């Protein structure tokens, strides 16, 4: 009997088996199990109904239910349309989710299918918005990458699942005239990776605790079949976006196959000599991610699998940098969206990113025994350093130059990054601005900026971090979890920029998670010194915190640290590490 007839498949490293009915026979070998889990989550509150007479007994939708349709109308929410009066209800599921909606329905009138409109929204406003056919205008939503505004028929005395997107709010409109539907349940269907949060962070400031967890949850939602940039859009593997996400995964979950799968997929989709995602900067991020991922997991076999791609990429870069340090990798230079108008600054940051990538590329080649390519990386970097550009007051560029060692971190912070505090920070490159501040010893300022900038999103109702955020947007903005009062700005519909105006703006974007790994690295002070976390340095920086504690996942187990500030400012640390891990201090 072939394995297929036994009806049991072992999926990845998961111990649970997947049983396939024997009738599939050899066809079972062509099936693909769903590696994600599902949760049914009832609404946390009824935000709004069009009229109490049109939507009755709505409170039953807040119950967890059992998912089973029942004939009739007992203990159900009834929605009526009378003439031109449409029955509508807006549900709040309490936090950002990835997945869809399940409707469990009773009897309809007239009996049979009824037409409804279902709108998903990451904000109240988006769930009540109109789409503009993809013209990307502020104040309008889109169905780009995921359907979030759907008109469809639903059954009587049955159930149906609708949608696959990122959302917190759902609006349901009954469209048929003189019609009735009865909703027994309307849970969200959350699709996610069923994995433990091995890393943790707690300190004396609850705001920082919330920020750390929000970054962790933001990335967790984006760990779908592959590692996405955002769960509403683009739902794509972008290598550059992955760097903060992978940093967060290492701090929160440890090893996860989604990283390997996503890197592999990107290399398959964009074989050399193409740049990854068609962007030369994202090929640079590939080298940086590979080195940091190896240092955490110590998986040399995975690096060997990518040997040809790594060395081939280095050859491509080498062919684009002449002896005078002029480079011609690509005409398009992209760091992040907010930096785009500052072309001179982007040029300086781009070259700094390339130097950082080449430094990690040389280390990768040494590990692989590719001494010639390691030397080639160093030679290319040497040529680039003949022309060190100025950051042109761009915080993104100054941060990369500080991280890459092309600019003294103290100067980068004093002259550019620290100017105005959180002003001109960005959700993606804010991570590297924080890294530059840490390198300059400005830990307190970094904590203050985290509280103000990332905390500013929480103040506006965020439960995950956004694709973009400008503090200026918040001056007169209403929260995302309520209707916008007259005279207030809509934080979702009125803002956004570049390719994400208005409601196209993603409110769950993994590249915004930087404070999570940053606080693990610099507040808890956990630094990986040897591949596979074999040696860890613990050097905390509490700033104005009284204490901090947390855990960090390694291939050998979870490390626990606790730091308490005593009278006089001295910090007393407790460190517990698994066997096989050497812990050193300052």
Where are these regions (language model features)?
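Bacterial Sec-dependent N-terminal signal peptides
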Residues: 1-18
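Extracellular/oxidizing-compartment recognition motifs
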Residues: 17-225, 241, 257-259, 301, ...
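Non-catalytic C-terminal accessory modules of carbohydrate-active enzymes
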Residues: 24-25, 31-34, 44, 48, ...
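Active-site acid/base region of carbohydrate-active enzymes
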Residues: 126-127, 169, 178-214, 219-221, ...
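Alpha-helical repeat scaffolds
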Residues: 410-418, 450
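Repeat-solenoid scaffold signature
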Residues: 421-460
């Amino acid at each position: 009997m072939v394995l297929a007839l036994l009806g049991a498949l072992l999926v990845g490293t998961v111990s649970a088996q997947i049983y396939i009915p024997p009738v599939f026979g050899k066809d079972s070998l062509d099936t693909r199990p769903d590696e994600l889990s599902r949760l049914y989550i009832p609404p946390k509150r009824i935000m709004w109904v069009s009229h109490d007479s049109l939507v009755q007994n709505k409170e039953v939708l807040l119950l967890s239910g059992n998912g089973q349709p029942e004939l009739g109308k007992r203990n159900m929410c009834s929605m009526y349309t009378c003439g031109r009066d449409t029955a509508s209800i807006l549900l709040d599921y309490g936090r950002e989710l990835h997945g869809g909606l399940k409707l469990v329905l009773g009897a309809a009138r007239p009996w049979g299918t009824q037409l409804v409109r279902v709108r998903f929204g990451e904000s109240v406003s988006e769930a009540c918005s109109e789409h503009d056919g993809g013209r990307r205008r502020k104040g309008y939503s889109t169905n780009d990458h995921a359907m979030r505004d759907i008109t469809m028929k639903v059954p009587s005395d049955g159930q149906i699942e609708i949608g696959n997107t990122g959302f917190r709010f759902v609006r349901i409109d009954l469209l048929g005239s003189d019609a009735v539907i009865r909703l027994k349940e309307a849970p969200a269907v959350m699709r996610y990776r069923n994995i433990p949060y091995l890393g943790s962070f707690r300190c004396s400031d609850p705001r920082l605790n919330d920020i750390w967890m929000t970054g962790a949850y933001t990335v967790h939602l984006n760990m779908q079949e592959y590692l996405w940039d955002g769960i509403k859009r683009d739902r794509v593997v972008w290598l550059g976006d992955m760097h903060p996400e992978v940093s967060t995964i290492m701090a929160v979950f440890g090893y996860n196959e989604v990283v390997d799968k996503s890197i592999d997929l990107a290399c398959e989709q964009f074989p050399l000599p193409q740049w990854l995602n068609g962007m030369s900067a994202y090929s640079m991020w590939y080298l940086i991610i590979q080195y940091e991922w190896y240092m955490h997991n110590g998986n040399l076999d995975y690096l060997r699998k990518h040997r040809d791609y790594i060395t081939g990429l280095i050859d491509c870069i080498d062919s684009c940098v002449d002896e005078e340090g002029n480079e011609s990798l690509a005409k398009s230079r992209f760091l992040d969206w907010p930096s785009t108008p500052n072309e001179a600054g982007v040029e300086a940051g781009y070259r700094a990113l390339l130097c950082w990538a080449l430094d990690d590329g040389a280390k990768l080649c040494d590990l692989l025994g590719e001494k010639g390519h390691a030397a080639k990386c160093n030679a290319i970097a040497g040529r680039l350093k003949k022309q060190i550009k100025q950051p042109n007051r761009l915080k993104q560029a100054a941060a990369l130059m500080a991280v890459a060692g092309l600019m003294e971190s103290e100067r980068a912070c004093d002259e550019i990054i620290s100017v105005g505090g959180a002003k001109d920070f960005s959700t993606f490159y804010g991570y590297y601005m924080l890294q530059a501040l840490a390198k300059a010893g400005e830990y307190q300022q970094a904590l203050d900026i985290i509280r103000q900038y990332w905390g500013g999103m929480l103040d506006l109702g965020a439960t995950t971090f956004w694709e973009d955020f400008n503090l200026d947007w918040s001056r007169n903005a209403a929260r995302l979890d309520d209707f916008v009062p007259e005279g207030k700005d809509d934080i979702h519909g009125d803002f956004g920029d570049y390719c994400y105006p208005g409601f196209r703006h993603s409110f769950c974007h993994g590249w915004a998670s930087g404070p999570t790994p940053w606080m693990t690295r610099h507040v808890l002070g956990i630094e990986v010194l040897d591949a596979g976390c074999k040696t860890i340095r613990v050097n905390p920086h509490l700033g104005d915190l009284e204490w901090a504690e947390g855990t960090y996942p390694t291939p050998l187990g979870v490390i626990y640290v606790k730091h308490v500030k005593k009278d006089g400012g001295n910090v007393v640390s407790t460190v517990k590490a698994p066997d096989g891990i050497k812990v050193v201090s300052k």
